[in-house]
């Protein structure tokens, strides 16, 4: 499938800023089942950009803008050819060994409730692949999905206790439970083409990957209860949202900041 992504982020400031520094994790890599045909990052003002890779192997772009700046728009766009590989991820730039993804973070720390859920599923599913599928569907059944953009920095234990959240919450809970069982798991950010849903979205999508013996890294979209197929564009990975967030950075200047995001995921010609 060919998927076109147009991801626009607009920052507006109540007072002009003297300098902006942004870290962008918005460039998808090519690997088995995903081929980036074209990709670009455009800024509506003079800026300096430097591209490299981070400690997870993600493509990152550092953006430097000198002021005065009261508004800036960052547009990421491109076309990606995808194939359905039933969630199995191969051919990626793996900088870290699987065991590195056993580390817990403040966003993926498992409390008693998440530990109990994980142990319950482990008792009824001896095989790792079936265990992970069961974990995905059980979390989905216990959580109510919220549309719109939530708080991606909410801890997994808080979201699980409240019983609702956005895709980032679902991925964090899954990672917390899997790691508690000694299964390497990681957070994934990217885009989802919705065949019967709106093309324009308010944020990027998020899911998780877990290490399965004899298969390798395998994706689980907990919010939708499926393994990623050719409707998914995989962009960045990390231990949690902080490590794979599309944008992060700092600004030099006073005043308030307002951010608007518009993501269009479509097929060419739509």
Spans of features found by a protein language model:
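Flexible, active-site-adjacent loop/turn segments at secondary-structure boundaries
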Residues: 11, 15, 24, 29, ...
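Short capping/connector residues at structural and topological boundaries
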Residues: 18, 70, 106-107, 150, ...
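Structural beta-strand/beta-sheet cores of well-ordered domains, especially the beta-sheet scaffolds
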Residues: 1, 7, 22, 39, ...
């Amino acid at each position: 499938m060919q998927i076109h992504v147009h991801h626009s982020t607009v920052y507006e400031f109540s007072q002009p800023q003297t300098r902006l520094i942004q870290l962008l994790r918005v460039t998808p890599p090519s690997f088995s089942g995903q081929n980036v045909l074209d990709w670009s990052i455009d800024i509506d003002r003079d800026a300096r950009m430097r591209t490299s890779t981070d400690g997870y192997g993600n493509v990152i772009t550092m953006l430097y803008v000198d002021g005065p700046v009261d508004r800036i728009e960052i547009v990421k766009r491109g076309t990606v050819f995808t194939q359905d590989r039933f969630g199995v991820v191969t051919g990626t730039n793996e900088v870290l060994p699987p065991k590195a993804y056993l580390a817990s973070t403040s966003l993926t720390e498992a409390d008693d409730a998440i530990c109990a859920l994980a142990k319950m599923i482990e008792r009824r599913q001896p095989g790792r692949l079936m265990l992970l599928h069961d974990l995905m569907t059980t979390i989905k059944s216990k959580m109510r999905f919220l549309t719109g953009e939530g708080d991606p920095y909410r801890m997994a234990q808080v979201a699980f206790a409240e019983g609702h959240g956005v895709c980032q919450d679902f991925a964090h809970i899954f990672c917390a439970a899997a790691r508690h069982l000694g299964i390497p798991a990681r957070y994934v950010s990217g885009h989802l083409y919705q065949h019967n849903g709106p093309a324009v979205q308010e944020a990027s999508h998020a899911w998780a990957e877990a290490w399965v013996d004899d298969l390798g890294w395998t994706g689980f979209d907990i919010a939708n209860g499926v393994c990623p197929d050719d409707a998914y564009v995989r962009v960045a990975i990390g231990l949690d949202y902080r490590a794979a967030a599309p944008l992060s950075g700092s600004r030099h200047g006073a005043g308030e900041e307002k951010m608007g995001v518009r993501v269009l995921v479509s097929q060419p010609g739509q």
